[in-house]
Amino acid sequence: MPTLLAPLNKLSSDVRRAALLNIPVTARTISVVLTRTRDIDMTVRRLVYGSVLLTHAELPDDAMPGAAHPRALTIAQREQIVRHGLGDREPAVRAAAGKLIGAWVDAVSVGTKKGAVFEDLLAFLGTFDLRESAVVEDALLSVFVTRVDVFDALEFDGAHLSS
């Protein structure tokens, strides 16, 4: 495995991009992939969020979650993705991270019934440490910006407000 991951540490950003696109994202490789969220090259950082993690975050029907599915990541890894992605200096990287975080809402979706958006957002928030984390607010705001459909579908009634 070390030989397979070695190109991710090469000086050439082209080599790192090619390695990211061809490396299998597994529980053993995800931590190395996440180190590229702090790459010096903006294109590599954008690729991590917009291609590698996004592709492996979606859950095919009746399949086990991939290594980049929000439930497969640790809380620390999810928080790292949010912090580094939404805090990046480049707007293109922030946009790619926002798209990934928006996709997480669908990835952890609990149902398809009418009005399930609130429950889906609760499931999304449940993937974070709500007591200790400061990035949850950023993640939720990002969902509201990138997923206008989610924001527009939110309805608060007395049952939600009384609990």
Predicted regions located by residue number:
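N-terminal alpha-helical segment
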Residues: 29-30, 78
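Alpha-solenoid helical repeat scaffolds
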Residues: 1-28, 51, 67-71
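Long internal repeat-built scaffold domains in very large eukaryotic proteins
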Residues: 62-163
